[in-house]
């Protein structure tokens, strides 16, 4: 059995191994494969039985020209890079990795928030540059600092990751306002309740995006919805970049309507030099690393191997195109 991994570098830049897949068949791992040249994708898959992809597209053309494919594993939770309908037509299961990064992504959302509230990186830098040593007072701060206790955290998308973020927010003394199409009353308590979107927008001091990217959520942070928000709101996004209309957020940051934003995702990745967010006020941008702690990546690898093992046993799991 031949296994091809089209783009394995981000998952395993060298601190993990591929032994789990190698034990199941001949395994060829490419660090990267073209996102646009489908001939390269097709050539690399060749006569493989099993294909793993993270961000490399697999449209209909790939399935048509690679007839040996029996199983596709997506090395991520999102699977929009694979034409799952064509795969289903051909009887090919596509399996994703649904829960590997819950804790890491929730933790990172709060890390963005705490950096916005305390400017730890900036103050560390200026201390090392000598500003504290030369200061006439025993302490100083270059930016206003924010206490979160008692403030409202609005979370759009209250699935596993939204709940993980909400749990930490509640531990910091925040009250969670959750918006989700599917409500679980068991999650409600004195510090967490479900609300409609307009109430979340108008009552939240911090808004975190943890919803999937669907047509109905694309651009959910736009000028119309920003106008409904509190003045000085903080916006966090480590879900999907296109949830935000970036120019609308830039305008709101520069006007002060939005006090700050913490973003681990943008509309086009890697970010382009002309992205207006790069020039916006009070905008922290990190390079899509919420998912990337070694513990999280090891969990992803283990689930990816298990997905294939279960398929080979005849009982596939985490299939997204049943």
UniProtKB/Swiss-Prot annotation:
Keywords: Carbohydrate metabolism, NAD, Nucleotide-binding, Oxidoreductase. The active site is at residues 240, 269, 288. Transmembrane segments: none annotated. Pathway: Carbohydrate metabolism. It is an enzyme of class 1 (oxidoreductase). One of its GO terms (molecular function) is hydroxypyruvate reductase (NADH) activity. Its EC number is 1.1.1.81. SUPFAM superfamilies: Formate/glycerate dehydrogenase catalytic domain-like (SSF52283), NAD(P)-binding Rossmann-fold domains (SSF51735). It catalyses: (R)-glycerate + NAD(+) = 3-hydroxypyruvate + NADH + H(+). The keyword Methyltransferase does not apply. NAD(+) binds at residues 160-161, 180, 211-212, 238-240, 264. Signal peptide: none annotated. Involved in catabolism of D-apiose. Catalyzes the reduction of 3-hydroxypyruvate to glycerate. Belongs to the D-isomer specific 2-hydroxyacid dehydrogenase family. This is Hydroxypyruvate reductase. The gene is hpr.
